[in-house]
């Protein structure tokens, strides 16, 4: 008489119901634009993709390989940065806004989220100098 035992390891997922995409900033400048040197202007943003499952569980999945990211106009790149997905705006980006989309597919369940980011370019800079009295403009030839 022979007795056989078999075991199967199966991963079960509850269906996903929604995804939200958030960021630490929503206004960016291209990576080589001089505006990146000014306070509060950055060429990158750290993204968080929070997924809600059918059972109510919410989890951040932005660095999970099953979540894919895309950006309109090919204006940026994505890379893992600690617990975030870092979006960096490409120096060749010549638009006033971009849309970032994250998509997660688990089994037959797919959720996606999109977020719009404003792009600013420093195109000109005007500097006016004054003497110490703060009322007489300095002029030089």
Region spans (language model):
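Extracytoplasmic soluble-region selector
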Residues: 1-141
């Amino acid at each position: 008489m022979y007795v056989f035992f078999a075991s199967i390891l199966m991963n079960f997922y509850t269906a996903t119901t929604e995804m939200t995409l958030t960021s630490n900033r929503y206004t960016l400048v291209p990576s080589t634009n001089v505006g990146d040197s000014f306070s509060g202007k950055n060429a990158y943003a750290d993204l968080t993709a929070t997924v809600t499952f059918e059972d109510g569980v919410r989890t951040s999945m932005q660095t999970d390989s099953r979540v894919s990211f895309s950006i309109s106009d090919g204006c940026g790149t994505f890379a893992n940065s600690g617990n975030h997905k870092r979006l960096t705006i490409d120096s060749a980006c010549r638009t006033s806004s971009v849309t970032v989309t994250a998509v997660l597919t688990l089994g037959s369940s797919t959720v996606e989220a999109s977020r719009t980011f404003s792009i600013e370019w420093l195109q000109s800079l005007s500097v006016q100098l004054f003497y110490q009295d703060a009322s007489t403009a300095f002029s030089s030839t």
